[in-house]
Each structure stands twice: as structure tokens, then as C-alpha cells.
Amino acid sequence: MAELRAAQAEDVSAIAAIDPLGLGRLEEIQALVRDHACLVAAERGEIVGFLALKPGHFYKRDFIDLTFVAPRWRRQGVGRALMRAALRNASTSRVFVSTNDSNMPMRELLRSEGWAPSGVLSGLDEGDPEHVFFHDVSAG
């Protein structure tokens, strides 16, 4: 299983390489790492996934803003491990996350991990509504 740890400055380029929009949001990734809001999953030193947990970002609740796993590491428990680590590191009793309607693997992961639907937002990505979920940290 991949090692989970806080992202370091030297991880930024590897994180950006996993994110399909990584180069377009390089400054955002750098800020997340600088603010200690980014976890990475590493396998034999290679960054294979990352997650950004923004404390108090969503109506004063923690929000998982970005979660990406490198394509060849998907469906191997990396995303699940990152999500569980985010809950362990949460600073609020309830954590929120959102994903596009088209992202069935993420929606299935969230449901299997006990995340509850909170609502649907339209108008963010044309034709692909955003599903919002929450997890009560105290519930495990």
C-alpha cells in the first residue's frame, strides 16, 4: 500500500503531473502544499495520488477540494486511503466534498465509505452537475 504523508515543496511538480489541470493551477497547488493542506500517496518514492483538505473552507466546515490518483494506480485503494486520511486529519466534525455527475468511480467510492448526499449544484460545469457529499467524522 502507498505511503501517505503531507506534501512537501519538492512534490509540487509530481502533484501537478497527476492533475489534468495541474499546470494551469500550479500556484494553487504550491499554496496548498505551503499551507499544509495537501496529502500525497507515494509508492516507492513516486507520487501516485494527492488530496487537498481545506480547513473551514465550506461554510466553516472542512472541504476536500481536489483528489486525484494517477491513472495506472486507480482502483487499487489509493483514493480510499487518501479519503480516510483526510477524515482522520479533519479539523471539523463534518467534512464536505463534491464531484461531477460524470465521475461515477468517485461517487461510488464516497457511497461505499459512508458519505451522505448533501445536494446537487448546477451551472459549474456545463451539462455535468456537481454532487455534494458530507461525512460525520465522529461516525467513523
Model-flagged regions — what are they?
Residues 2, 6-65, 70-71, 83-84, ...:
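Acetyl-CoA-dependent GNAT
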